[in-house]
From Swiss-Prot:
Annotated organism of origin: Ralstonia nicotianae (strain ATCC BAA-1114 / GMI1000) (Ralstonia solanacearum)
Keyword Phosphoprotein carried by entry: no
Membership in a protein family: Belongs to the uracil-DNA glycosylase (UDG) superfamily. UNG family.
GN (gene name): ung
Protein name: Uracil-DNA glycosylase
Gene3D superfamilies in the record: Uracil-DNA glycosylase-like domain
Length: 266
């Protein structure tokens, strides 16, 4: 089962407006309202995590930054959770914080970040780390990816959760929202996700992601490699074989595999 357009999310955002732009009511969408618009399965999983953390303080910080006129990316903070139901998640690829830069689509400047780790909106130039991810997939399968887009919503629709450990960032300020409360929430989400339903694949690239291994109980496939950044990809990410390994393991578990050569949505 996959999700396509989510009516609750669609009512919050206008796709014709850039990230951080005012809504039809003249303001941004508060973070708490974005949580309230989540599908019921993710609200049930994430709700206890918010109760264990200082969620009101995080909301006040993010909303306050936006109210002050700072461009905060992405607009749709929980976009990844709208695309893949909890029970459909078979692979988790863990990122760090959202892209803090912008790209150009049809002459318009847009944020690179759109709520999925490593992914960018269609039309935005594919970032270097994602180019290395594509390069590894092509090497493993001996085929070129057909599309040049960096939008990974097709993977999300197949059951790949592309999750950053920090879900917001200020434009041009890398890690500007780190240590504001997101890490405790996403740690809790990972722990809960690892303890419900079927076994899953966790791809942990780089030391930041690998530090989360302690959150994961036995029974899952945990794949570790250096980060796909150009600074580290040649130290073991390229040649890691993670994508075929994930599919081999999923097939052995009786689960559907991922078509890694189809990153874009249908």
């Amino acid at each position: 089962m996959t999700r396509r357009a989510d009516p609750a999310q669609a009512t919050l955002f206008d796709d014709d407006e850039p990230a951080g732009a005012p809504t039809a009511t003249g303001g941004f969408v508060p973070l708490a309202d974005q949580f309230d618009a989540l599908p019921a399965d993710w609200k049930a999983l994430l709700g206890p995590c918010l109760a264990r953390t200082d969620w009101p303080a995080l909301c006040a910080f993010v909303d306050g930054e936006r109210a002050a006129g700072k461009p905060i990316f992405p607009t749709e903070v929980f976009h990844a959770l709208h695309l893949t139901p909890v029970d459909a998640v078979r692979v988790i690829i863990l990122g760090q914080d959202p892209y803090h830069g912008t790209g150009t689509v049809d002459g318009r400047e847009v944020p690179q970040a759109h709520g999925l780790a490593f992914s960018v909106p269609a039309g935005v130039r594919v970032p270097p780390s994602l180019r290395n991810i594509y390069k590894e997939i092509e090497a493993e399968y001996g085929r070129k990816l057909s599309a040049g887009s960096g939008n990974l919503e097709g993977w999300a629709q197949q059951g790949v959760l592309l999750l950053n450990t920090v879900l917001t960032v200020e434009q041009g300020q890398a890690a500007s929202h780190a240590r504001r409360g997101w890490e405790r929430i996403t740690d809790c989400l990972l722990e809960h996700l690892a303890r419900v339903g079927h076994a899953r694949v966790f791809m942990l690239w780089g030391s930041h992601a690998q530090a989360k291994r302690a959150l994961l109980p036995e029974g899952h496939l945990v794949l570790e490699a250096p980060h796909p950044s150009p600074l580290s990809a040649h130290r073991g990410f390229l040649g890691c074989g993670h994508f075929r390994a994930a599919n081999d393991w999923l097939a052995a578990q009786g689960q559907s595999t991922i078509d890694w050569l189809r990153p874009q949505a249908d």
